[in-house]
Amino acid sequence: MPTHNAVPKPCQARTRRFAACLMMAAWLLGAAHAAHADQALWELGLGLGTLSVPHYRGSDQNHHWVLPVPYVVYRGDIFRSDREGTRAVLLDTERVDLDLSLGGTPPARSRDNRARTGMPDLAATLEIGPKLNLRLGQGAGWKLDLRLPLRAAIAAEDHPKSVGWTLSPVLNLDVQWQGWNLGLQGGPMAAGRAYNAYFYDVTATQATPVRSAYAARSGYAGWGATTAATRRVGNWWLAGFWRYDSVAGATLARSPLVTQRSNQTFGVALSWVFKVSDARVPDRP
């Protein structure tokens, strides 16, 4: 079976689980955190979680993992990992801020995916790029932002390679309610030709009687919405999220590798926060 790389199988398994751990930590840590007058500069913890995620958007098969979940919060002036996600802050004002943000997708083995049988494996991707955040409104216990992330994507193969770009603007609402920190966001997605091709192209040599050749185009890539909740009780941190994705009407929807028009992703985790810095920093609204 052809693959994108020649990493030994035990290493591939470790890579898949490591990528899944990072993805789950990013989704959950970026969900919401409580606001206080001042907070610890950093916090460390470790827990356990479960994650269900599609092999790729438009796939009718899912990964199901039980994973260790690292809890890492850092509230520095430039580098931060908190309720806004993991990023490097480039500009920070009351209404507008600009940061360098991260994203990614999990790996998938073609032998585990019926639609991709005999095709190259999908490596995990790392997405990185600028994100412009515009504060639209704020009140007691809530805030509404428009977030505009534009990211370059890199496939984590033996020799990492660029696989294009993604743009996924979202409206993001954060709410504090009875000790819970709730987040809701959603918006459309767009991607370049190389990004869509990595996931959805079928070359002439990969075509079969039930899988026609297909060349992806750039453009509209569907939409997604995520809801999440977290709560801190003493040194315990509980978090969960649910995401809905749709590729209906997307330029990639006619690929034979798209076997359903919508996907759901969800995860829950419980972590024990075992170390907190003595240094304190003011909360950033």
Q: Language-model segments: which ranges?
A:
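Short glycine/proline- and aromatic-enriched beta-strand/turn motifs that initiate or cap beta-hairpins
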Residues: 36-80, 275, 285
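Outer-envelope beta-barrel architecture signal
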Residues: 38-44, 64-66, 77-79, 92-98, ...
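Residues on the lipid-exposed face of transmembrane beta-strands in outer-membrane beta-barrel proteins
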Residues: 48-52, 68-74, 85-90, 128-134, ...
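Sequence/structural signature of outer-membrane beta-barrel proteins
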Residues: 51-57, 105-111, 135-139, 151-158, ...
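Outer-membrane beta-barrel translocator domains and adjoining extracellular loop/strand segments
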Residues: 57-62, 111-116, 157-164, 195-203, ...
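Outer-membrane beta-barrel transmembrane domain signature
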Residues: 158-237, 245-248
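Predominantly the C-terminal beta-signal and adjacent terminal strand-loop region
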Residues: 228-285
